[in-house]
């Protein structure tokens, strides 16, 4: 009698858990249908409602609990099959800063970067569009700097990027971003549902960094990393190849799984011996600099509080602005550390 009762309770608990899981899955599916791209705006309202009504009808009309569960699950599978068929095109009415993909050509230790971005800004939205071809000697690549910037005054979320420094004072910034189209506005939820494509900005620091410090009023912190020249070259080449891949195989941006930080870490984990733990890739990327410090990736012997205080480059960037020596002048805190 006791065993039978336990089995009944287990069956009820299992059924409740199954329905809770299905509720979560169908909530996701409803949002996926809602956020999909439609030719007619009315479809965004009607299709999710129809989807929910179909589910309700199945729950009412299918009598046996197991069959009801199976029927509702099959509907979810149909949504998944539709979802898989949605692929990025690499074609769109993109905003000028993300309209042109950079790509590399390797010739031994020399790499030519085509379409390197070097916009000259007068305001956030007023700029001269410039794409350049530049050649770099990978043997002269010496270090990697880590950038983290905050756009809303909050510490939890941030944008992260890297900059690769050569022994002749040149720097190439690499920033993974949304490939926004004209009229687009970023929303956290939309970023979960294949609404944006991924883009690699490969550019001059006077563009990639200066636009954030001087024209978008973001707080930018710049850290020197402990990455060796050998690993810096491997990492730089891997980023360039990643950017090149997007020409033939566009990717979707994803708020949680394919954003500025997770993509950056994807390259780091592919190339460098030290791997970034899974949870640190996704949770509160505004603290990525602290995670890098804790993992011994940042150079210097200061406490993190001291290092972070010195790393803010906004005042130096505003002062340097149009100066051709912009990259050196935003790094005077590195000179202080060496004294």
Q: What are the functions of these language-model segments?
A:
Residues 7-58, 240-339:
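Activation targets extended, charge/polar-rich intrinsically disordered C-terminal tails
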Residues 58-65:
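Structural signal for the C-terminal ends of transmembrane alpha-helices
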Residues 65-88:
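Internal/C-terminal transmembrane anchor helices
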Residues 68-74, 97-102, 116-133:
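Juxtamembrane/interfacial segments around transmembrane helices
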Residues 88-107:
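Alpha-helical transmembrane signal-anchor/signal-peptide segments
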Residues 109, 114-116:
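Juxtamembrane extramembrane loops of integral membrane proteins
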Residues 111, 122-220:
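Glycine-rich catalytic cores of cysteine/serine-nucleophile enzymes that process amide/ester linkages
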Residues 187, 193-270, 277:
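Soluble catalytic domains of enzymes that build or remodel membrane lipids, polysaccharides, and related
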């Amino acid at each position: 009698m006791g065993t039978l009762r336990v089995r009944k309770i287990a069956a009820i608990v299992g059924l409740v858990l199954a329905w809770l899981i299905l509720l979560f899955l169908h909530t996701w599916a409803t949002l996926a249908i809602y956020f999909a791209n439609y030719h007619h705006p009315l479809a965004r309202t009607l299709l999710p409602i129809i989807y929910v009504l179909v589910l309700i009808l199945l729950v009412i009309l299918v009598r046996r609990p197991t069959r009801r569960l199976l029927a509702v699950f099959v509907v979810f599978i149909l949504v998944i099959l539709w979802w898989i068929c949605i692929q990025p095109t690499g074609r769109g009415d993109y905003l000028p800063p993300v309209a042109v993909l950079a790509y590399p050509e390797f010739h031994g230790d020399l790499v030519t970067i085509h379409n390197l971005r070097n916009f000259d800004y007068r305001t956030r939205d007023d700029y001269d569009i410039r794409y350049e071809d530049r050649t770099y000697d990978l043997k002269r690549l010496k270090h990697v700097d880590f950038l983290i910037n905050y756009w809303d005054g909050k510490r939890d979320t941030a944008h992260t990027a890297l900059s690769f420094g050569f022994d002749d004072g040149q720097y190439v910034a690499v920033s993974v971003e949304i490939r926004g189209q004209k009229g687009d506005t970023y929303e956290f939820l939309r970023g979960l549902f294949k609404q944006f494509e991924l883009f690699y900005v490969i550019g001059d620091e006077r563009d990639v960094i200066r636009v954030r410090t001087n024209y978008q009023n973001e707080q930018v912190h710049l850290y020197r990393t402990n990455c060796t020249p050998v690993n810096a070259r491997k990492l730089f080449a891997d980023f360039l190849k990643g950017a090149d891949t997007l020409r033939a195989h566009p990717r979707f941006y994803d708020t949680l799984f394919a954003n500025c930080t997770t993509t950056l870490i994807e390259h780091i984990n592919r190339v460098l011996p030290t791997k970034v733990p899974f949870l640190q890739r996704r949770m509160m990327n505004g603290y990525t600099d602290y995670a890098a410090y804790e993992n011994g990736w940042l150079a210097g012997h200061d406490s993190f509080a001291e290092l972070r205080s010195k790393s803010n480059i906004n005042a130096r960037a505003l002062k340097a602005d149009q100066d051709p020596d912009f990259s050196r002048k935003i790094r005077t805190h590195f000179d202080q550390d060496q004294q």
